[in-house]
Each structure stands twice: as structure tokens, then as C-alpha cells.
């Protein structure tokens, strides 16, 4: 037996195995936590795949929040007692772990009652700024979701960990907006309809409750290409 040749082959095989293991570990580390949501695979959406009305509303509210952010440390857009609660939350946020922060933000906004866009703004569909929502102290699912998104951004949560998700709820045959947040313990869903109001839930436990339609943040747009008839469902739940 050629010991030298055998040793060389073993060395090559070992190096290949190590390279493959490193590649697998790197791939796992770089995996997009939002690649699949509620059991459905996400696809980057082009202009033809993403609804124009969603893009229009999102572009407007994003610009408004960037030009005049509502929730600063002085809580200038809030009235008592909301301002005091926000200032307290803002002071504690830096020391909170991820899940405690999500529960706190969920609770802060979910304490407000639900109402429709028609009741608040006299139109069928409106994407409010956080200031609009908090001044009225009520809103529909979009209002809660948008406000939670911008609140978490104000607390330093990066955009790539956040997704606004338009979903379909088959049990109610309606569309509904929620916020998905990536953490070290997985992706959690912030919904205005949950009780207790601070409840956050892992996305993988909600496959039967939500069918994702579209997803967006400041940098991207995604579609899940569900059945077309879901897009013709009733208006969003409040």
C-alpha cells in the first residue's frame, strides 16, 4: 500500500468536507428569516407583481414619517397619558431584550380601540401616519401595523428585521395586515387582534391562520403568489 498516496487522498477528502461544512454554516447564517412565512415561500416582487395602490400608500406614509417622525423622546405628537407611557417605554427600550421590546410595543398600540378608515378619515382606504393614528387613538389593522413598524425603527430595530405583511385570513374570508419581526429566536407576529394585547406569536405556529399575500419594508417588496381569488376577498379586518 502506498501510505503517502493514501494519506494525501485522506487529506484532500478532509479538506473538501471542511469546505462543504463551512459553506453550509455560512449559508445557514446568511439565510433570510423571511424566505418563508406561514409556510409560503416569498419571491422578490417586480413592478408588475406588486399592487400599485399599496406602493402608492406606502411611499406616501414613509416619506411623511421620514420628513416629520412622530415619536421622538419628547413624544411631541402625543397627549397625556400616552406621552408619559411612551417616554417611559423609550427610556426602558435600550435595556430590553428583543421579545420584551416587541411585547411592550404591541401592548402600547393594541390598547387603542379598532375603527375603520371611513369612520376616521371618510374614505374606504387610508394608510395613516403614526401621528394620525395616535391623535385619533384608534384605527384599522394597517394603522396598528404601520405604527408598530415606525416605533420599532425609532427604537433602533433595523429595517431588514421588519416586514409589513398583507395576509388573508381564511377563517374569516378577509384580508388583514400584521407586522413580522425577525429575532434571534425566530420571526414573531405582532397583530392588533390578539388578547392579551401584548401577545406575540411565532410565525410557524400560524400557518392555518394567515395566508401571506404581499410583504414590504423600506428596501424591498415581496409576493407570495397565492390564489388570485384571495385578492378579491372582503376588505381588511380591523
Where are these predicted regions, by residue range?
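A structural boundary/capping signal
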Residues: 2, 26-238
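Bacterial N-terminal signal peptides that target proteins for export
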Residues: 2-14
Amino acid at each position: 500500500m502506498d501510505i503517502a498516496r493514501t494519506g494525501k487522498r485522506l487529506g484532500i477528502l478532509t479538506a473538501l468536507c471542511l469546505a462543504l461544512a463551512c459553506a453550509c454554516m455560512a449559508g445557514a447564517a446568511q439565510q433570510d428569516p423571511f424566505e418563508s412565512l406561514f409556510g409560503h415561500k416569498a419571491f422578490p416582487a417586480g413592478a408588475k407583481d406588486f399592487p400599485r395602490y399599496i406602493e402608492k400608500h406606502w411611499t406616501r406614509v414613509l416619506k411623511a414619517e421620514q420628513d416629520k417622525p412622530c415619536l421622538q423622546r419628547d413624544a411631541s405628537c402625543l397627549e397625556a397619558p400616552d406621552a408619559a407611557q411612551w417616554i417611559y417605554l423609550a427610556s426602558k427600550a435600550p435595556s430590553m431584550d428583543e421579545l420584551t421590546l416587541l411585547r411592550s410595543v404591541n401592548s402600547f398600540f393594541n390598547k387603542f380601540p379598532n375603527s375603520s378608515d371611513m369612520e376616521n378619515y371618510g374614505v374606504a382606504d387610508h394608510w395613516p401616519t403614526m401621528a394620525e393614528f395616535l391623535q385619533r387613538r384608534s384605527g384599522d389593522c394597517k394603522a396598528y401595523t404601520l405604527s408598530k413598524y415606525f416605533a420599532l425603527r425609532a427604537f433602533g430595530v433595523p429595517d431588514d428585521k421588519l416586514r409589513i405583511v398583507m395576509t388573508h385570513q381564511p377563517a374569516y374570508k378577509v384580508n388583514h395586515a400584521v407586522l413580522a419581526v425577525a429575532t434571534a429566536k425566530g420571526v414573531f407576529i405582532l397583530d392588533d387582534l390578539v388578547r392579551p394585547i401584548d401577545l406575540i406569536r411565532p410565525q410557524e405556529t400560524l400557518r392555518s391562520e394567515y395566508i401571506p399575500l404581499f410583504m414590504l419594508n423600506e428596501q424591498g417588496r415581496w409576493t407570495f403568489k397565492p390564489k388570485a381569488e384571495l385578492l378579491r376577498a372582503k376588505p381588511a379586518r380591523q
